[in-house]
Amino acid sequence: MTLFIRSDESGSFDYIHNDYFVFAGLIFTDRQQMELTARQFISLEKKLRSKNCYKNLPELKAAFLEHKDRRTLFAITQDCMRFATIIRLKKLDCQKVFADKKTKQRYMDYAFKLGLKNAINNLINRGSIFFEEATDIDIIMDERTTATNGKYDLGESILKELKGEIHSSVTKRTFAPTLPNTERVTVSYGHSDSNPLLRAADIIANRVRFECKYGSLNNIWT
């Protein structure tokens, strides 16, 4: 089995000017469903392009869309597996996390990894995927400034998190592996202007962050 994961982020990882930072996206277990969702998203985008306010935009990113159009695009993925990781920036140990670019990147990777693990555990609990299956994980994230070895380290870190037992030095507990037969985790970065599912992930991340700031988390998936 292959898990296809497409993810984007919303907000700036800056605790001075922002309260929330969000990773969000889609998880697919079937390539055909993934490709169908991409075609549906593109089709709706083409309809929205008929509006004068969007004709000159290079891509329909959430930040440039009217609220009702963001909701319409969000609804395209209502039957898909969606996930989000919400970081409350002002709750972090700011001196440690924001000490330099490397510590910021390490924390962002850590948060993404744990959020993804929780999402996969939810899928296992729902019976959407099975604990014992041999699994490849294909992750594409929207492009950001990351060193080449950073991409490799994130993939290796996710593989270790999912495949091996995890011992908590805080709780002194040992947690069983999530997907012990995971074979490969590949992480790559793409451009949303050429990948409709990254644009869909952008819409999801924007919606989650909006509800964090102005609404209720209970409203996110409706």
Language model features by range: what are they?
Residues 1-222:
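Phosphate-ester processing/binding pockets and catalytic centers
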